[in-house]
Amino acid sequence: MAHDVFNLADLPAKKEYYRGGETIVVEAEPSDGWYVLLSGKVGVYKKDFSVAEISKPGTVIGELGFLLNIPRTATLIAQESTLLMHVHITLDDLLTNYPAVVKHMIKILAERVVKTTEDWRDSMEKVSLF
């Protein structure tokens, strides 16, 4: 049975609330699942440098460590009062029982690749002007 990614009630997950400035996960620590942003804003940091801010409800966060079974690739810090759904599931269970969620995650990853490529191209164009 396919589940809509925005109908999170059936996923093995729990809501977690963070105050502004509170750390959600720390880069290089073990990954214990992934998150869906319900409300608020999350800052993404790599080695203490801000690399992104996420504020769109429904955005999947922390999926790389989960999908690749590697430690966290970034630190996440709530930028304001933030509500997340913390999902605890095995990859096999996700693939078998929640294909709509998997499709959503693939779309997000593809969009991030496009944005990263565009940002890189823009930065290279700026460098070539000098």
Regions found by a protein language model. Name each.
Residues 18-20, 24-29:
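Short phosphate-coordinating micro-motif centered on Lys-Gly-acidic
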Residues 11, 53-106:
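Cyclic-nucleotide recognition modules
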Residues 4, 91-130:
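A small-molecule sensor/coupling module
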Residues 10-11, 29-31, 48:
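Short, small/polar residue-rich loop motifs at catalytic or cofactor-binding pockets
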Residues 19-20, 38-39, 56, 80:
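A cytosolic small-molecule/anion-sensing beta-strand core signal
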Residues 1-20:
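Cyclic nucleotide-binding regulatory module and flanking cytosolic helices
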Residues 32-43, 47, 57-59:
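Glycine- and acidic-residue-biased ligand/ion/polar-headgroup-sensing regions
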